[in-house]
Every structure is written in C-alpha cells, then in structure tokens.
Amino acid sequence: MANFKVVVSDPKEGRAYQIDVKDAEANALIGKSIGDVVDGAVFGLSGYKVKITGGCDGSGFVMKPDLLGPRRQRILMAVGVGYTPKHPGQRRRKMVRGKEVAPDIVQINAKVVEYGSKSIKALLGLEAPAEAPAEAPAE
C-alpha cells in the first residue's frame, strides 16, 4: 500500500498544511499527473478542489512536469525544476522523476484551486474552539 505526505498550499491564506494520506485514499492518487485537479475529499478536504503541482520520491528526486510516466531518468538540464546552473549556459545531467504519481513517491505538493464552505483549519481539526468570555469578578 502507498503512503503519501501531501502538502496542500492555500494561496488565500499563504499557508501550507501537511496531510498524511494512507491506503485507499493514497491509491486514488496513483496514476494522477502534475497539473491534474483532484477532489479534496481524498485528503479530508470535502468541497475543495486541489491541483497537483509536484512532489518527490524517497531518494529526494523531484517530479518534473515535462517528463512523461512515473520513471526516474537522467536528463541533460540547462534550467528548470531540479537544477539551477552556476554559470550562464551551463548544462548538467541530473536524475529526475516523471510527472505521474507512483507508489514510490513520498511527498506530493498541491494547491487549492476551488474552495469549500468550511475552512481548511476546521476540516483538519486545527482550529481552536471558541472560548467563552471570562466574567468580570463581582465586587
């Protein structure tokens, strides 16, 4: 069974939330690609739509959006995801992973594209319950 750490970013709040996805929910993500919009109910965010933006595998190799399939491959890179050249025009062969989610992916990055009725904090149980105002001491 696959287990993923999904990092869901909320552009409105400027916050990111880490969610552990296991078993049946994780299997729903296998085969999806970078750029696919997924129902947020898979992560426990009912009513939300989430777009997959990237991720990495257990060895730390990043998912590259323009490499098809779930495989690892050494490609010649000049710029882009997974490589920053030190000098202009420098190219280097780097190991990257394809854009498809596979069972050996560890982390999936995503962002919210459609919001639900409840806040993400409330759905994940991070919102503190509202406290009743303290009564003034009687004199």
Swiss-Prot record:
Keywords: Ribonucleoprotein, Ribosomal protein
Encoding gene, per UniProt annotation: rps6e
Cross-referenced InterPro entries: Ribosomal_eS6, Ribosomal_eS6_arc, Ribosomal_eS6_CS
GO cellular component terms given for this protein: ribonucleoprotein complex; ribosome
Family recorded in the similarity comment: Belongs to the eukaryotic ribosomal protein eS6 family.
Protein's UniProt name: Small ribosomal subunit protein eS6
GO terms under biological process: translation
Pfam families reported for this sequence: Ribosomal_S6e
Entry's transmembrane regions: none
GO molecular function ontology, one term from the record: structural constituent of ribosome
Domain of life: Archaea
High-level lineage: Archaea, Methanobacteriati, Methanobacteriota, Stenosarchaea group, Methanomicrobia
